[in-house]
Amino acid sequence: MNRIDERLAALKAAGRKALIPFITAGDPEPDMTVSLMHALVRGGADVIELGIPFSDPMADGPVIQRASERALARGMTLARVLEMVAGFRRTDPDTPVVLMGYLNPVEAMGYAAFASAARAAGVDGVLTVDCPPEESDEYAQVLQSHGLATVFLVAPTTPAARLAAVARLARGYVYYVSIKGVTGAATLDVADVARQVGALREHLSLPVGVGFGIRDAETARAIGEVADAVVIGSRLVQEIEAAGAQAPDRLQALLAGIRQALDA
């Protein structure tokens, strides 16, 4: 078991739901990322999803696109993201970290080199948005051989063949995309999410995290009733964009309110 498995199993045993926040590495400033990660933990994060900035983030809405642009403009690279995780690990050996991003930077580094460097930095899992599960056997094998969980997205439109590949290759948890479209879009239908997550559980034994469209404590609590984990990203990145130097304190306060609602 890696840190993700241990944390999610402990939460399940305690009857609690996991809170998984997302931020983009290097936004608003590279020097602030590790402080933001610690602020998320103080606010109640169980797992941190750390976004790898990318020039063409096709699955992301305007808020996270702008975050990627800001981070890239400040010189962020995949290697620097790994340095940030290593910096976080110097004072937090326990909170699981999942890298979320696109395949191109990983391919540029090489699967094995990336997996080795990620593991050495203290990464626990990798979610590669544009890597189809049914084409991911080699990639998943390399990551898993280095002790990294392979997290995959599933959606209401995921076909049976792809779902079968996810069931075979996924580790850690599965990220259910609760609405069609890009991150930060639309309003989700909690009743529909409940039906879809119930159907997913017939095929998957891993914990199910739900993301896309969760913007406040009330929605997070409702999703927590039907899922194992609540993933929140665009709302936090929006807060970072508005808060500037106050981002760590603002993020901690925002997440603490969501944590309180989940535990109510």
Swiss-Prot record:
Annotated organism of origin: Laribacter hongkongensis (strain HLHK9)
Catalytic activity: (1S,2R)-1-C-(indol-3-yl)glycerol 3-phosphate + L-serine = D-glyceraldehyde 3-phosphate + L-tryptophan + H2O
Family to which the UniProt record says this protein belongs: Belongs to the TrpA family.
Subunit structure: Tetramer of two alpha and two beta chains.
MF annotations from Gene Ontology: tryptophan synthase activity
HAMAP family to which the protein is assigned, alphabetical: Trp_synth_alpha
Active-site residue list: 49 (proton acceptor), 60 (proton acceptor)
Top-level taxon of origin: Bacteria
Protein's name in the database: Tryptophan synthase alpha chain
CDD domains for this protein: Tryptophan_synthase_alpha
UniProt pathway annotation: Amino-acid biosynthesis; L-tryptophan biosynthesis; L-tryptophan from chorismate: step 5/5
EC number: 4.2.1.20
This protein's record includes keyword GTP-binding: no
Signal peptide: none
Cellular-component GO terms for this entry: cytosol
Role of this protein: The alpha subunit is responsible for the aldol cleavage of indoleglycerol phosphate to indole and glyceraldehyde 3-phosphate.
InterPro entries, A to Z: Aldolase_TIM (IPR013785), RibuloseP-bd_barrel (IPR011060), Trp_synthase_alpha_AS (IPR018204), Trp_synthase_suA (IPR002028)
UniProt KW keywords: Amino-acid biosynthesis, Aromatic amino acid biosynthesis, Lyase, Tryptophan biosynthesis
